[in-house]
């Protein structure tokens, strides 16, 4: 660690108060903030173990995951946890599973990675050969289910799966059980320094009614079932944790550029957490720049946070076949789009191998995924005016108005591997640098420009 020592007189001059101002438009999407009021940017990956259960649960996640993510400049992990592992029998919560979650959170804390605890489900849960809601909480009314091994997402449209979602949303005892599950998690991890918040359910779906097309059904499910569910679960979390952020997802249909039907969630710390997937690319197609998918997605997905004034964090994104001819352009355009409206994202998925994995067995980025590693400001002590990064020149620029005298004025930068020169102008100094990170101290109310240049 290389530390730059700053003379006391210089620091004192930076702490002298000056006038501050902010420029916020009516359509501005709020930024996610930390406990000190700093504007956060989250860049990271999903971390998961879907293969192991019981005594082996979470065993595929190791300390190496967090060490390697932080070494490449990422500060965020969306940790998948499963209700079927937490409560394998109704009313009996696995203390061993909670300890395993705690061990993973300990590694995140060690490497200064913020964690979102995600109550994950795929195709509802184990009753249908996947993970998520326990079998004891799965009610199908005897409706049929046919597996689709070559297209697992199609299983969401099987009658038994759709009916199971309806019961989860509507049955009073299942509502209470889901709320209790969240109280257990929030009570256990509310004081853990690595925990940023709670993603209440992954990619929720529901039951289509006769004559409905998919967008119409999705908006109805979001409006009539997901909105009240999220309000119930937010209340459950708040009964144990008053400070963590509550992340709420629309149905995955937003990936088709369909605005959500979600209503207001009555909680002061809500984050809108859509996923960013295109059905054609998920089926193996290349990115088609002429189709305008990114533009239509961005237009649709920003309506909710603008209306309800909540921050956005994209919980999953990234194509399966990332080495196709147009994927380099996709990653560049996707990164630019995400930077325009979100407070961050978690790519899918940090693992060592093929498929969706971010890196190969040697820990090297797989084709085009290196484009996700950019300089960014993890925490800005003030109001962000603009950020930009030009990969061609290797220049990152942040302009912000620093906070007032009674608030934090320490801004933190994350830098990808390599040699970087960091400079600050406007009554600000680069207080300290280490490999991959830098800290900037600014006078209160100053207009500050920070530049990081790849050498």
Which positions does each model-derived feature cover?
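Acidic (Asp/Glu)-rich catalytic clusters
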Residues: 66-73, 187-193, 261-271, 302-307, ...
């Amino acid at each position: 660690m290389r530390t730059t020592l700053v003379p006391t007189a210089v620091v004192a001059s930076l702490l002298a108060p000056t006038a501050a101002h902010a420029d916020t438009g009516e359509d501005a999407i709020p930024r996610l903030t930390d406990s000190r009021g700093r504007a956060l940017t989250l860049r990271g990956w999903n971390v998961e173990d879907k293969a192991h259960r019981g005594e082996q649960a979470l065993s595929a996640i190791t300390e190496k995951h967090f060490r390697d993510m932080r070494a490449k400049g990422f500060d965020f992990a969306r940790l998948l946890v499963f209700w079927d592992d937490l409560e394998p029998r109704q009313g009996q919560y696995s203390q061993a599973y909670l300890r395993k979650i705690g061990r993973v959170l300990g590694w995140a804390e060690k490497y200064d990675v913020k964690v979102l605890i995600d109550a994950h489900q795929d195709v509802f849960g184990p009753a249908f050969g996947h993970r998520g809601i326990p079998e004891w909480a799965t009610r199908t009314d005897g409706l049929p289910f046919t597996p689709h091994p070559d297209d697992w997402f199609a299983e969401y449209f099987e009658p038994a799966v759709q009916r199971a979602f309806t019961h989860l949303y509507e049955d009073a005892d299942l509502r209470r059980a889901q709320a209790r599950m969240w109280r257990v998690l929030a009570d256990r991890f509310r004081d853990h320094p690595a925990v940023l918040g709670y993603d209440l359910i992954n990619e929720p779906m529901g039951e289509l009614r006769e004559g409905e097309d998919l967008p119409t059904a999705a908006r109805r499910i979001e409006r009539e079932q997901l909105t009240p569910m999220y309000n119930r679960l937010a209340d459950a979390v708040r009964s144990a944790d008053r400070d963590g952020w509550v992340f709420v997802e629309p149905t995955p249909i937003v990936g088709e550029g369909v605005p959500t039907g979600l209503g207001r969630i009555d909680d002061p710390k809500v984050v809108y957490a859509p996923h960013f997937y295109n059905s054609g690319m998920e089926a193996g197609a290349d990115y088609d720049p002429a189709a305008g998918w990114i533009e239509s997605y961005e237009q649709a997905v920003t309506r909710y946070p603008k209306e309800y004034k909540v921050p956005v964090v994209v919980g999953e994104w990234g194509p399966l076949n990332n080495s196709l001819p147009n994927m380099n352009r996709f990653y560049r355009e996707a990164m630019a789009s995400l930077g325009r409206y979100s407070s961050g994202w978690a790519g899918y998925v940090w693992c060592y191998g093929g498929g969706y994995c971010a890196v190969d067995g040697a820990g090297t980025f797989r084709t085009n995924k290196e484009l996700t590693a950019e300089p960014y400001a993890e925490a800005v002590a003030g109001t962000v005016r603009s950020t930009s990064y030009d990969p061609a020149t290797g220049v990152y620029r942040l302009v912000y108005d620093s906070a007032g005298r009674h608030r934090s004025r320490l801004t933190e930068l994350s830098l990808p591997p390599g040699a970087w020169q960091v400079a600050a102008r406007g009554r600000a100094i680069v207080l300290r640098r280490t490999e991959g990170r830098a800290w900037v101290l600014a006078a209160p109310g100053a207009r500050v420009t920070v530049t990081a240049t790849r050498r």
